[in-house]
């Protein structure tokens, strides 16, 4: 009982309205002298805030001008396409709507399921084909499926799509690292990539929101 009481006295008393502010103060303190690329700081810190993983200060790779290019695209009403419903759910729709934009996820669409079955591929890959067929500029936020990144790479090489930005942050072990490196090899395509195995739909949504919150 004494030990439990001691633990309770060690808990910081923070008002709900101050929780996020205090979290970012802790993140800044723990980053110490780590130098972040100008313009990327908020994105990196939000990824750390979302995951409690400071590796994102090292493994997030930004192509030159990616942040500015992405924000300009959002201002023009460019839609975001995700590879999971979770990623879609995590993006701030109200903020996105301020710029006349919206977010799509085609993973549950019947035509996507049918195309995946007919072509012997994944729904994630088929959903990228559907996004390409929109005939619009698109920002892609991929947090789960490396097959989505592979298909995007193929579509870009075939000249069928020119993404405004690819957020490449799938998590896992099979083809995850390789698919991210494919995106990094596309020197003409703006990208934000979490190198290595880490990432997730929550990180994909987090990066989208970090872009929105600094506009």
Please name every model-derived segment:
Residues 87-90, 146-152, 173-177, 200-204:
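Short glycine/serine/threonine-rich phosphate/pyrophosphate-binding segments
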Residues 83, 166-168, 207:
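Buried hydrophobic positions in well-ordered alpha/beta secondary-structure cores of metabolic enzymes
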Residues 174-215:
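C-terminal functional extensions of proteins
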Residues 102-110, 161-177, 189-196:
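Short, acidic/small-residue loops that bind anionic groups at enzyme active sites
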Residues 96-134:
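Long, charge-dense
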Residues 2-38:
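Charged, compositionally biased N-terminal leader segments and the immediate start
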Residues 80-82, 105, 140-142, 192-194:
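General beta-strand structural signal in soluble alpha/beta enzymes
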Residues 58-73:
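A short, well-structured juxtamembrane/interface segment
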């Amino acid at each position: 009982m004494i030990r439990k009481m001691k633990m309770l006295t060690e808990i910081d008393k923070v008002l709900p309205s101050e929780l996020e502010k205090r979290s970012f103060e802790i993140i800044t303190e723990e980053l110490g002298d780590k130098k972040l690329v100008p313009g990327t700081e908020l994105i990196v810190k939000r990824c750390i805030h979302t995951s409690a993983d400071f590796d994102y200060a090292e493994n997030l790779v930004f192509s030159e001008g990616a942040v500015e290019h992405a924000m300009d695209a959002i201002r023009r009403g460019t839609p975001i396409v995700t590879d999971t419903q979770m990623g879609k759910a995590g993006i701030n729709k109200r903020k996105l709507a301020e710029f006349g934009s919206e977010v799509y996820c085609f993973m549950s669409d019947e035509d996507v399921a049918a195309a995946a079955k007919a072509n012997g591929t994944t729904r994630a890959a088929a959903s990228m084909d559907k996004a390409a067929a929109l005939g619009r500029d698109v920002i892609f936020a991929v947090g789960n499926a490396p097959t989505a990144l592979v298909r995007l790479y193929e579509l870009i090489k075939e000249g069928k799509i020119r993404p405004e930005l690819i957020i490449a942050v799938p998590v896992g072990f099979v083809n995850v690292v390789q698919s991210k490196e494919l995106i990094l090899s596309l020197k003409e395509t703006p990208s934000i990539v979490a190198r290595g195995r880490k990432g997730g739909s929550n990180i994909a949504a987090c990066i989208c929101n970090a872009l929105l919150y600094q506009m």
